[in-house]
């Protein structure tokens, strides 16, 4: 199979879909890999690194899409890429379709086979290709939240951990999954007072056992969230319904309950956001203010630490990439039910129910 690795063109997206180690694995199995020039530069990989393991370098993104049977990326294609995607071409990347109707329609029209990292799901409901980036995003959510609490960044001027004699910042984390757990670990390590919420009591019991003593757990309900808002300094939104739009846990009306310059970090923005007032931002312009509340809603948070996040992501995706290349997408998905759940749009049909439901489109079960 011919595999193409284009350079990411989303704003400040510095990751790359495949490392030289991944290329070497595919070349060893007699596949051909084309990498766009400088695609890996911001993750620490030179063109020479790719050439040394057997990749061929192409100068332009158009060249990569034109020649490849399968495209391996990090983030969803953006508008300039839509016309480059061919009928029957496999595109293996994060898509987050439920948050973007135009993207969904474009991929339907393209006739491509769109396999979304974020909906590959194992029998135990774990999300093996979302987990590594959720770990990075959770840790970074606390890191950026702490920065935007600083006065020069528009925040309250509070230090997360305080100092002796001065109370630390209070952090509310909505969602106790991978993102929330990692955010809580970071916030606790910085010395903040942390409250983490979830609707799953079994999960809350687990978190109570494994997280530090300065992290408390709370059942997630509208009433409980409202009770916390007047006293918090930082809110991290990390709720997830796989493949579906995130629910709005904080409405615009609820912003009035918070003190001015409270910081909201919406990690769920990829799936539409869990705050009513959220809209996607970029690393170059990461925040905006609504009713006195600072919002951070960068849609590719891990892109700011490309070395760490590229390595973590490709460690997880490579076995699936190899299976797709060696077997073809139909056989690979037939052999692996987890991978089959990644099929979101296939040759003009919406094959993931949550995506179809969000947009009122026809859902068609894929036959393998």
Model-derived features: positions:
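An N-terminal-biased, well-structured beta-alpha scaffold segment characteristic
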Residues: 2-110
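Rossmann-like adenosine-cofactor binding region
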Residues: 209-291
């Amino acid at each position: 199979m011919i595999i193409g690795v284009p350079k990411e063109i989303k704003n400040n997206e510095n990751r790359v879909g495949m490392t030289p180690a991944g290329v070497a694995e595919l070349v060893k199995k007699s596949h051909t890999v084309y990498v766009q020039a400088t695609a890996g530069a911001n993750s620490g990989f030179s063109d020479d690194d790719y050439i040394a393991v057997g990749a061929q370098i192409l100068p332009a993104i158009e060249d990569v899409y034109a020649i490849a049977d399968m495209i391996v990326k990090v983030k969803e294609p953006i508008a300039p890429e839509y016309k480059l995607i061919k009928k029957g071409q496999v595109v293996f990347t994060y898509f987050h379709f439920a948050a973007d109707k135009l993207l969904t329609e474009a991929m339907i029209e393209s006739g491509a086979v769109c396999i979304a990292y974020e909906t590959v799901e194992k029998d135990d409901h774990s999300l093996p290709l979302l987990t590594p980036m959720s770990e990075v995003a959770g840790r970074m959510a606390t890191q950026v939240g702490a920065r935007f609490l600083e006065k020069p960044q528009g925040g309250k001027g509070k230090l997360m951990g305080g100092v002796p004699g001065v109370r630390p910042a209070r952090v509310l984390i909505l969602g106790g999954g991978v993102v929330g757990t990692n955010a809580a670990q970071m916030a606790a390590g910085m010395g903040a007072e942390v409250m983490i919420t979830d609707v799953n009591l079994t999960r809350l019991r687990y978190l109570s056992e494994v997280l530090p003593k300065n992290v408390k757990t709370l059942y997630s309900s509208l009433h409980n969230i409202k009770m916390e808002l007047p006293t918090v300094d930082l809110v991290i939104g990390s709720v997830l319904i796989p493949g579906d739009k995130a629910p709005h846990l904080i409405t615009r009306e609820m912003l009035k309950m918070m003190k001015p310059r409270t910081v909201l970090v919406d990690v769920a923005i990829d799936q539409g956001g869990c705050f009513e007032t959220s809209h996607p931002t970029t690393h170059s312009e990461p925040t905006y203010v609504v009713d006195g509340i600072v919002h951070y809603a960068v849609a590719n948070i891990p892109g700011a630490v490309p070395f760490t996040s590229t390595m973590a992501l490709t460690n997880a995706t490579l076995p699936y990439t190899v299976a797709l290349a060696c077997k073809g997408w139909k056989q690979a998905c037939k052999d692996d039910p987890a991978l089959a759940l990644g099929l979101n749009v296939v040759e003009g049909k919406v094959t993931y129910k949550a995506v179809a439901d969000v947009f009122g489109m026809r859902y068609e079960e894929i036959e393998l």
